[in-house]
């Protein structure tokens, strides 16, 4: 029997959360379906792709033209290219990630008379679209079969625009590269507090630095994994507070599992998120965790006082109290660790693929 044919559409396959998820979905679905990935712009895939996956692109580059007429003209060209690829490859279902790709994919699918699933990944409290693009998005999304979002908060946002029956909550999976790398035997004698994430506005790593400087910490170290534009100012802050010997900035790491396995605590300080992948990974590794209750994601992952602590965004006093409590309570650490590992079982890639397949099989 001929296998069903699915095309994934996304802007590029460079490094990023949406790009990783599409890659992992495609790599897992290739065993049951013929998979094509179409990118709007030509890029070298950052994540490893199964060689059986066909890779196509709409154009070599995309210019950010300011004129409305040129932008619309380029948009119609991309839709035309997508229609051609759909017909040439006899695609039966399109799955698209990110707003611009979603809009093009919906209209290309409609012209090709096949179903389309789209997925939004952004936090819409933070990333505002231009008004015209917002209107085009809202009109276009009425013609998709399903809209996939990562959190209940995002579902609530889109429920004002679409029927709730069309909106599916499917979170990100735990990165396949981290699966089966959990090893508590790697815990060292050092008491390590870990933070993982880019250094940029909204990540608020300075909150952890300030809180750490105010509590009894003689036996503890803080490791920051990640790079970005605000890294140097955070380094300067540790010097100003005279705790630079206690704080380690190790940059972006390929072997991130080493840091997850060695950490005693994980502190997540973001002011906003689309979906907090690092927080999910920390819970998967069973690290006792404190997280800000920002929009969106932490409240979907953490049950306060069960598998971690949720604290108000930006509240240094509460963070200090919870850190001191957790640092000095081994029983609570063990409780959070055990419950965290249990709570992340549903985020394994096999579980997430099954959620997607439940709806794929309804359409093709």
Model-predicted segments: where are they?
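A conserved mid-protein helix/loop that constitutes part of the nucleotide-sugar donor-binding site
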Residues: 19-24, 191, 195-214, 229-235, ...
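Short His-centered aromatic/hydrophobic patch
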Residues: 96-102, 120
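Aromatic "clamp/platform" in nucleotide-sugar-dependent glycosyltransferases that forms part
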Residues: 252, 271
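Short hydrophobic beta-strand element within catalytic cores of glycosyltransferases
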Residues: 288-292
């Amino acid at each position: 029997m001929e296998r069903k044919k699915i095309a994934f559409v996304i802007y590029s396959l460079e490094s990023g959360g949406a790009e990783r998820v599409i890659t992992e979905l495609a790599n897992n679905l290739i065993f049951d379906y013929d998979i094509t990935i179409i990118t709007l712009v030509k890029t070298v895939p950052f994540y490893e792709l199964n060689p059986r996956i066909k890779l196509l692109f709409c154009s070599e580059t995309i210019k950010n033209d300011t004129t409305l007429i040129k932008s619309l003209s380029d948009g119609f060209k991309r839709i035309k290219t997508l229609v051609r690829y759909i017909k040439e490859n006899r695609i039966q279902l399109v799955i698209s990630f990110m707003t611009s790709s979603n809009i093009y994919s919906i209209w290309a699918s409609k012209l090709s008379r096949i179903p389309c699933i789209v997925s939004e990944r952004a936090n819409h409290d933070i990333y505002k679209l231009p008004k015209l693009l917002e209107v085009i998005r809202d009109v276009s999304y009425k013609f998709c079969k399903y809209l996939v979002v990562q959190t209940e908060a995002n579902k609530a946002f889109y429920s004002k625009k679409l029927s709730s029956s069309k909106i599916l909550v499917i979170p990100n999976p735990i990165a396949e590269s981290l699966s089966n790398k959990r090893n508590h035997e790697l815990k060292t004698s050092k008491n390590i507090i870990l933070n993982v994430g880019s250094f940029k506005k909204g990540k608020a790593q300075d909150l952890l630095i300030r809180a750490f400087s105010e509590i009894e910490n003689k036996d503890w170290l803080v490791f920051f994994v990640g790079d970005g534009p605000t890294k140097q100012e955070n380094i300067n802050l540790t010097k100003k507070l005279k705790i630079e010997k206690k704080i380690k900035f190790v940059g972006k790491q390929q072997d991130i599992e080493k840091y997850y396995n060695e950490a005693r605590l994980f502190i997540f300080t973001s002011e906003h998120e689309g979906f907090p992948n690092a927080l999910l990974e920390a819970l998967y590794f069973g690290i006792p965790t404190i997280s800000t209750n920002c929009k969106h994601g932490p409240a979907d992952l953490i049950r306060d006082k069960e598998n971690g602590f949720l604290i108000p965004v930006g509240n240094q006093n509460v963070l200090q109290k919870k850190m001191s409590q957790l640092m000095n309570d081994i029983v609570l650490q063990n409780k959070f660790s055990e419950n965290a590992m249990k709570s992340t079982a549903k985020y394994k890639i096999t579980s997430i693929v099954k959620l997607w397949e439940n709806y794929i099989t309804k359409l093709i």
